[in-house]
Design a protein with these regions (language model features):
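Non-heme di-metal
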Residues: 1-167
Length: 167
């Protein structure tokens, strides 16, 4: 039974949506921030999201709208089901979710919590995505995962710094 019910293009579109929502969130939340440190980090992360969008657009050129091949490997089938569940999350499906999230934040600490959550969700999604993409795309996803981990570390470090200094 083929458990992967979306095309390779659909999966790449989900990844693009993640990055687009991240870009919108970092832009909106950065503009609203009163902390120079938060604003500068969000500017950097927004620039990173732009670069990631370009990477996924390049990966997407190799995928048609046909469904990715199924597999009898239960581990990959489980990944496909997980991707499908993630795909139903609003962050992955709603085009303006990044803006809505940014408008809902109350302060810098809240913005950092949302950003940390978004980065964690991205990492989880990309790990699962690595299991179903073509071999030549796995290395690119590995690099993106490493970058997302660095983003997560920077966000966590800034959150800890701000909580200690009370900024």
């Amino acid at each position: 039974m083929d458990t992967l019910r979306f095309s390779g293009k659909d999966v790449i579109d989900m990844a693009l949506r993640i990055e687009e929502n991240g870009l919108t969130f970092y832009t909106e939340a950065g503009n609203a921030s009163t902390s120079d440190k938060v604003r500068e980090l969000f500017q950097f992360l927004g620039d990173e999201e732009k670069r990631h969008i370009h990477c996924f657009e390049n990966i997407g050129h190799g995928y048609a709208s046909d469904t990715l091949p199924g597999t009898s490997d239960p581990y990959v089938e489980e990944s496909a089901l997980y991707l499908g569940a993630l795909a139903n999350s609003r962050v992955f499906t709603e085009p303006n979710e990044g803006k809505k999230l940014a408008q809902a934040v109350r302060d810098e600490d809240d913005a950092l919590r949302v950003a940390i959550s978004m980065e964690k969700d991205s990492i989880l999604f990309y790990y699962e995505l690595q299991k179903v993409v073509r071999d030549q795309d796995k290395a690119v996803l590995g690099q993106l995962i490493d970058e997302e981990k660095k983003h997560l570390a920077k966000l966590t470090e800034l959150q800890n710094l701000l909580s200690r200094t009370g900024e």
